[in-house]
């Protein structure tokens, strides 16, 4: 199913893009996704990939509990184009086919990132070659899934903590213009998809990184670059929930959309999960939350127990608290 039909169904069910905070008891909703849609959001999603979906019980659980999936690794540069011009899509195709079968929205993740970048890309020395590589890579990957992806994370983690640009091969050769090149290539290849810039540590209203994100997104959008949304990864520690909620409001004011894209909170504290959830609900254009994994067992931070469900798919106390908002 194309994402546009899923989007239409979500809008029909909710009646609005988003709504102010209202009380919806758990008795009215049976899953995180249905709860969030009852608040006018598009989805509560999760990260997954072929390797996790093939584990016993995981695929069925995700299809039941969540409304969106993000490929954790299978759409990254090293997975899709490990050698120049040699593309591999087996794992990404598996995820997309699964999502379409279960009517789940998809967030494509990610075209350009400083990590999981093939060595051959890092070794590029001239501008023209790099521009061609960026455009070819994005047009090929986005073009393959044209019309099937709700949103793409076009660039990922491009800022340092002090708000300066991360010194990657992209920035070193092309300056900030590489961002324009990437977004324009993505828009050309998949014109109906929402295009995002995604980053971590955007959780403090006073952080230099957050201020840089807002500054540059505002500048780029004013210049006509097709930057539609900001993704806040939201890998949090206990006690960060309230600040994160305030930061989401600031990010939402800078773009058409904002989304919490990789949520996990060390120890899964109830108060922080409530604060983050309310923060998204209260921001009209916060379209959804993606948990960075369906259960602790499959989390990149498994030992920190940061997710809403334990290894046996049992909901934690934070789930009940969220559903009672």
Curated annotation (Swiss-Prot):
Active site, renumbered: 157, 262
Keywords of this entry: Carbohydrate metabolism, Disulfide bond, Glycoprotein, Glycosidase, Hydrolase, Polysaccharide degradation, Secreted, Signal, Xylan degradation
GO terms of molecular function: endo-1,4-beta-xylanase activity
Reaction catalysis annotation: Endohydrolysis of (1->4)-beta-D-xylosidic linkages in xylans
Main location (coarse class): secreted
GO cellular component, as recorded: extracellular region
Disulphide bridges: 280-286
Listed name of the protein: Endo-1,4-beta-xylanase 2
Annotated organism of origin: Claviceps purpurea
